[in-house]
């Protein structure tokens, strides 16, 4: 969660009532702490700050800081200790042990896989799925990571210590640790415990005897040396090794079997959630590019060539044999899906995968937090010509107002100066200031009254346009002028080829290169990012062909941008016409 830099929203001293509440919460969440220890962790008079921040994936986190070090953090109303706290209270949480080489992966945001656990003679601590746990390294009981158990101890042993063991939230050397004094873990000797009797059913659970023996015989240096001698660096990275950090937890299956399973998952997910009856007939290439790719789980990449089917057409033929879909060649060489049986048991029984909010991928190309559109609010700046009108309310040249504030001020000004027509309440008499501010020169001797709507409209027209952009988790940004819409155009290239050009993505917090990569996958067309001509420090995205339909769907439906901020959507190809 803190593998990358976070953004601080606020940092305030804690109130007395909040301090008492925090102390009560700590006592409830960590019952092993005595009263004196709780008071020591959450001091009564010493400085204690509440820091509200946003993690790099957008999670809102509250951090409690004492003595310059983060001691606790709160996520989704759950309280977690930091490594600084665990170094003072190493027995606060059930602690699992792993190899020192794994720490680097944990700091990078990876979860801890079960093959990376070191099983002590006393067996593994007894935990349930979802329990808060600590992770320490071989030879030192000082925890270096905090996480949540992905399964119970019994399930871990039943799985043969394979799969994901812990979702890691915070670790030594991550950015939360860096916000403190950056001290190193203390040296705490491991406890010398004898293996318990399983019949007692208490404390810890012993692992398989053969597994324990094998784990005890392994030393980190010997295994690392052996793997380095036998495998290339790229192969060694893929191998779980002592760290047990697999990119794919389904290590018991071949790559081809995994890809077959992923292909069917994306196919069923797309039919259940993305494809609609109105989309039929649907080009098979569109099914793959616009629907199946977007349903691929985070951290995984769909590659049909690595599956047993090798080609999309062969896979769809198999799905047609199962009577899930019906495929026809509506035009020569081009296949389309013409019917879908949405009542088919495989579709109705398909469970949409829900990714864990704390799950991370150790792949370099892992996705960032989902895009959230900014809140865009029109504003108005007071120009020199309108200063006389607004100075009564304390505004001066350059002051920024919302439309509702302008309306309220004009109404109050008219009433305060007795300008509302006594015979017709819908009319406002114009005093010298209003005449100078909102009337044209040729009107100043002829127009003496205006209706309310005309008065307010003219006033807004005379003010200078501005706007406020607020991105989630960031402070509002005010800029003068009108925000430029996302501009979509078609350009004619050599050989009568068309390209779709998109500009001004940056103004809405969109990364042009990320958008280009997404469109390349969705449209199955080449994309390039180039400098926008005539626009300093701005770039444009070019997509081969008329891809405005795909682009509009991406901007409107997935990114949820208002249509009024996008121009050029009307140039999308009409249904039935060749792009």
Curated annotation (Swiss-Prot):
Pfam families: Pre-PUA, SUI1, WH_eIF2D. InterPro entries: EIF2D, eIF2D_N, eIF2D_SUI1, Pre-PUA, PUA, PUA-like_sf, PUA_eIF2d-like, SUI1. Its main location: cytoplasm. GO terms for molecular function: RNA binding; translation initiation factor activity. Residues 224-233 have a biased composition (Basic and acidic residues). The modification Phosphoserine is found at residues 232, 356. GO terms for biological process: formation of translation preinitiation complex. It is found in: Cytoplasm. It comes from the Eukaryota. The modification N-acetylmethionine is found at residue 1. The keyword Lyase does not apply. One of its GO terms (cellular component) is cytoplasm. Residues 486-559 form the SUI1 domain. Residues 93-173 form the PUA domain. Residues 378-462 form the SWIB/MDM2 domain. The keyword NAD does not apply. Residues 222-250 are annotated as: Disordered. Keywords: Acetylation, Cytoplasm, Initiation factor, Phosphoprotein, Protein biosynthesis. Belongs to the eIF2D family. Translation initiation factor that is able to deliver tRNA to the P-site of the eukaryotic ribosome in a GTP-independent manner. The binding of Met-tRNA(I) occurs after the AUG codon finds its position in the P-site of 40S ribosomes, the situation that takes place during initiation complex formation on some specific RNAs. Its activity in tRNA binding with 40S subunits does not require the presence of the aminoacyl moiety. Possesses the unique ability to deliver non-Met (elongator) tRNAs into the P-site of the 40S subunit. This is Eukaryotic translation initiation factor 2D.
């Amino acid at each position: 969660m803190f593998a990358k830099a976070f953004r601080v929203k606020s940092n305030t001293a804690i109130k007395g009532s909040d301090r008492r509440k925090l102390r009560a919460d700590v006592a409830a969440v960590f019952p092993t702490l005595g009263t004196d220890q709780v008071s020591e962790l959450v001091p009564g008079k010493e400085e204690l700050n509440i820091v509200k921040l946003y993690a790099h994936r957008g999670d809102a986190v509250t951090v409690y800081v004492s003595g310059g070090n983060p001691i606790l953090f709160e996520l989704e109303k759950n309280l977690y200790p930091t490594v600084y706290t665990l170094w003072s209270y190493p027995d606060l949480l059930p602690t699992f042990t792993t190899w020192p080489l794994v720490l680097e992966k944990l700091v990078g945001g990876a979860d801890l896989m079960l093959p990376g656990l070191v099983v002590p003679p006393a067996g593994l601590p007894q935990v349930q799925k979802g329990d808060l746990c600590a992770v320490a390294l071989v030879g030192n009981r000082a925890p270096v990571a905090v996480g949540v158990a992905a399964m119970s101890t019994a399930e871990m042993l039943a799985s043969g210590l394979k799969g994901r063991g812990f979702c890691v939230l915070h670790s030594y050397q991550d950015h939360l640790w860096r916000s403190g004094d950056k001290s190193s873990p203390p040296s705490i000797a491991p406890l010398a415990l004898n293996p318990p009797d399983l019949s007692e059913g208490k404390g810890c659970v012993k692992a398989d005897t053969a597994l324990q023996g094998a784990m005890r015989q392994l030393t980190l240096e010997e295994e690392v040396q052996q793997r380095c001698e036998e495998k290339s660096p790229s192969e060694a990275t893929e191998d779980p090794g002592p760290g047990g950090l697999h990119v794919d937890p389904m290590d018991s299956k071949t790559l081809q079997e995994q890809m077959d399973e992923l292909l069917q998952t994306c196919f069923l997910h797309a039919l259940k959630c993305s494809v609609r009856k109105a989309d039929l007939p649907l080009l098979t290439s569109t099914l793959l590019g616009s629907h199946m790719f977007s349903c691929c789980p985070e951290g995984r990449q769909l590659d049909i060539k690595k599956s047993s089917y090798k080609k999309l057409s062969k896979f769809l033929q198999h799905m047609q044999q199962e009577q899930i879909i019906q495929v026809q060649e509506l035009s020569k060489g081009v296949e389309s899906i013409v019917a879908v049986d949405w009542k088919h048991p495989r579709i109705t029984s398909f469970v949409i995968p829900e990714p864990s909010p704390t799950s991370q991928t150790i792949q370099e190309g892992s996705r960032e937090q989902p895009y959230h559109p900014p809140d865009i609010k029109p504003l108005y700046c007071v120009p020199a010509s309108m200063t006389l009108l607004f100075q009564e309310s304390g505004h001066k040249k350059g002051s920024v107002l919302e439309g509702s504030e302008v309306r309220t001020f004009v109404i109050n000004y008219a009433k305060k100066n007795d300008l509302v027509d006594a015979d017709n309440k819908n009319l406002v008499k114009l005093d010298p200031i209003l005449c100078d501010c909102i009337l044209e020169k040729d009107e100043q001797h002829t127009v003496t009254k205006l209706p309310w709507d005309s008065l307010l409209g003219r006033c807004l027209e005379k003010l200078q346009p501005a706007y406020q952009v607020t991105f989630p988790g960031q402070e509002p940004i005010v800029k003068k002028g009108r925000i430029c819409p996302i501009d979509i155009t078609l350009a004619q290239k050599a050989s009568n080829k068309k390209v779709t050009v998109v500009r001004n993505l940056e103004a809405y917090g969109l990364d042009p290169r990320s958008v280009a990569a997404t469109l390349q996958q969705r449209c199955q067309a080449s994309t390039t990012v180039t400098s926008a001509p005539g626009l300093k420090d701005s770039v444009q995205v070019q997509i081969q062909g008329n891809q405005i339909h795909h682009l509009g769907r991406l901007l409107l439906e997935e990114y949820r941008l208002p249509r009024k901020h996008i121009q050029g959507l009307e140039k999308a190809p009409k249904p039935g016409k060749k792009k």
